[in-house]
Swiss-Prot record:
It comes from the Eukaryota. The gene is PFD5. Pfam families: Prefoldin. It comes from Arabidopsis thaliana (Mouse-ear cress). One of its GO terms (biological process) is mRNA processing. Keywords: Chaperone, Coiled coil, Cytoplasm, Nucleus. This is Prefoldin subunit 5. Induction: Accumulates in response to cold. GO terms for molecular function: unfolded protein binding.
Length: 151
C-alpha cells in the first residue's frame, strides 16, 4: 500500500491530475507485467536447455539421436563430442564450452533471471499500489464532487 504521505499528496491533486497519475501507473504496471512474462518465458527456456544438457551428458559418444533444427523439425545425427556444447550467448553468437561450463552458464543465467524477476515483481507491486491508491482517492473526490453538486 502507498504511504500515507503519498496519499496526502494525492488528496491535494485535482481530478485531472489523479486520472493522469492513475493512467500512468496502470501503464507502467502493464509494461512491468509484460517484462515479468518475458523473464518467466526465458527462464522456462533456460530450464529446458539445462535439462537437455543434463540429458546429453548422460548419453555415450557415438550415440544416434534426433537433433532439433526447429521446434518441430528434427534430423538424425550422431553424438560426436559428448563433452563439448555450443552455447547461444545472444544476437546469433555461440561459444563452444565444456559440458560442465555449459551447465554452469545456464544455471547462472537462470539465477540472474530469477533475481531480476524478484526485483521487477517488487517494483510492479509498488506501482500497482500507487495506481490503486490513486484510484481510491479519485473515487472519493468524484463522490465528494457529485455530493456537493447534488445538494
Amino acid at each position: 500500500m502507498a504511504s500515507s504521505s503519498s496519499r496526502g499528496e494525492m488528496e491535494k491533486m485535482g481530478i485531472d491530475q489523479l486520472k493522469a497519475l492513475k493512467e500512468q501507473a496502470d501503464l507502467e504496471v502493464n509494461l512491468l507485467q509484460d517484462s515479468l512474462n518475458n523473464i518467466r518465458t526465458a527462464t522456462v527456456r533456460l530450464d529446458a536447455a539445462a535439462a537437455a544438457l543434463n540429458d546429453l551428458s548422460l548419453r555415450p559418444q557415438g550415440k544416434k539421436m534426433l537433433v532439433p533444427l526447429t521446434a518441430s523439425l528434427y534430423v538424425p545425427g550422431t553424438l560426436d563430442e559428448a563433452d563439448k556444447v555450443l552455447v547461444d550467448i545472444g544476437t546469433g553468437y555461440f561459444i563452444e564450452k565444456t559440458m560442465d561450463d555449459g551447465k554452469d552458464y545456464c544455471q547462472r543465467k537462470i539465477n540472474l533471471l530469477k533475481s531480476n524477476f524478484d526485483q521487477l515483481f517488487e517494483v510492479a507491486a509498488k506501482k500497482k499500489s500507487v495506481a490503486d491508491e490513486a484510484g481510491m482517492v479519485l473515487q472519493a473526490k468524484v463522490k465528494q464532487l457529485t455530493a456537493a453538486t447534488t445538494s
